[in-house]
């Protein structure tokens, strides 16, 4: 404590040995120290600590693993490209600018199946036409022809030639 202010805080009026200033100073200092200790060990009744942070909420392992896979894939592709570049520099010169484009159709198989089906149907129709036998009677048609020639000969004014 400050000694210059002792005379104001503790006046020198001594009527009793219990009222001596040094004893009173000791008591006040003891109370002060105990009060200071109680303040230091006091705990607040309101919890002012931050909430408990779980690492699995902050640090997403699945995202880290996904990023690591992407990085590994990129590194692998870079390594492959470097090997191709090294092989191109090491080996003989080659022309590799041929752009062979093959038309890719989404329904090529369907069109091929349809074409095969139509071809088979056409071949079947052609076979039926070739195998078909005439159904008219030749003898009856010749008799009919002779009758019509006779009718024409009888009705015409001029004679017909023999080969008509």
Curated annotation (Swiss-Prot):
InterPro entries (alphabetical): CFAP97D1/2, Hmw/CFAP97
Which GO terms of type biological process are on file? sperm axoneme assembly
Q: Which domain of life is it from?
A: Eukaryota
Q: Which UniProt keywords apply?
A: Coiled coil
Query: Where in the body, by tissue, does this protein show up?
Result: Expressed exclusively in testis.
Q: Which residues form a coiled coil?
A: 61-90
Name the job this protein performs.
Required for male fertility through its role in axonemal doublet stabilization which is essential for sperm motility and fertilization.
Q: Which family does it belong to?
A: Belongs to the CFAP97 family.
Designated name of the protein: Sperm axonemal maintenance protein CFAP97D1
């Amino acid at each position: 404590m400050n000694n210059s202010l002792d005379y104001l805080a503790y006046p020198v009026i001594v009527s009793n040995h219990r009222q001596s200033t040094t004893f009173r100073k000791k008591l006040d200092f003891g109370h002060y120290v105990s009060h200071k200790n109680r303040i230091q060990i006091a705990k607040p009744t309101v919890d002012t600590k931050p909430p408990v942070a779980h690492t699995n909420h902050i640090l997403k392992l699945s995202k880290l693993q996904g990023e690591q896979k992407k990085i590994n894939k990129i590194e692998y592709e870079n390594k492959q490209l470097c090997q191709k570049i090294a092989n191109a520099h090491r080996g003989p010169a080659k022309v590799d600018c041929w752009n062979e484009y093959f038309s890719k159709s989404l329904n090529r198989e369907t069109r091929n199946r349809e074409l095969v089906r139509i071809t088979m149907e056409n071949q079947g129709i052609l076979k039926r036409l070739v195998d078909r036998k005439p159904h008219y009677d030749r003898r009856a048609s010749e008799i009919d022809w002779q009758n019509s020639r006779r009718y024409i000969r009888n009705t015409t004014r001029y004679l017909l030639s023999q080969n008509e």
